[in-house]
Amino acid sequence: MARIAGVNIPNHQHTEIGLTAIYGVGRTRSRDICVAAGVAFSKKVKDLNDADLEKLREEVGKFIVEGDLRRETTMNIKRLMDLGCYRGVRHRKGLPLRGQRTRTNARTRKGPRRAAQSLKK
């Protein structure tokens, strides 16, 4: 298995798809990396030689990926929460941020329903 940016890239996949195993690299960025490195994106990962892998590592290294990207995202959310702005408050409460309705729906963000409280005594 090829190892790029601390991630094992699956051998059986094409280079373009295999690079998407790296957090922060999608299909578009993967294609751009392959073009910049001069590697055919239809080539399987197991068929890449050491020179190709080194070029890919160099190109991926130009972007913020994996742990650094996760840390940056977490810090941005923490900053919003510390500011106390609307988006930060919504993050803190675990509610949708972008104006979606919450009276019904929003189950993904709010989590599973709580058991209904019975009003009878």
Curated annotation (Swiss-Prot):
Keyword Amino-acid biosynthesis: no
Region (Disordered): 94-121
The organism's place on the tree of life at top rank: Bacteria
GO cellular component: cytosol; small ribosomal subunit
Stored SUPFAM superfamilies: S13-like H2TH domain
A GO molecular function held by the record: structural constituent of ribosome
Keyword RNA-binding set for record: yes
Family annotation (Gene3D superfamilies): 1.10.8.50, 30s ribosomal protein s13, domain 2
Keywords from the UniProt entry: Ribonucleoprotein, Ribosomal protein, RNA-binding, rRNA-binding, tRNA-binding
Biological-process GO terms, alphabetical: translation
Pfam families: Ribosomal_S13
Entries under InterPro entries matching the protein: Rbsml_uS13_C, Ribosomal_uS13, Ribosomal_uS13-like_H2TH, Ribosomal_uS13_bac-type, Ribosomal_uS13_CS
Function (record text): Located at the top of the head of the 30S subunit, it contacts several helices of the 16S rRNA. In the 70S ribosome it contacts the 23S rRNA (bridge B1a) and protein L5 of the 50S subunit (bridge B1b), connecting the 2 subunits; these bridges are implicated in subunit movement. Contacts the tRNAs in the A and P-sites.
Family to which this protein belongs: Belongs to the universal ribosomal protein uS13 family.
Quaternary data: Part of the 30S ribosomal subunit. Forms a loose heterodimer with protein S19. Forms two bridges to the 50S subunit in the 70S ribosome.
HAMAP family recorded: Ribosomal_uS13 (MF_01315)
Protein's name according to its UniProt entry: Small ribosomal subunit protein uS13
UniProt lineage: Bacteria, Pseudomonadati, Pseudomonadota, Betaproteobacteria, Burkholderiales
Underlying gene: rpsM
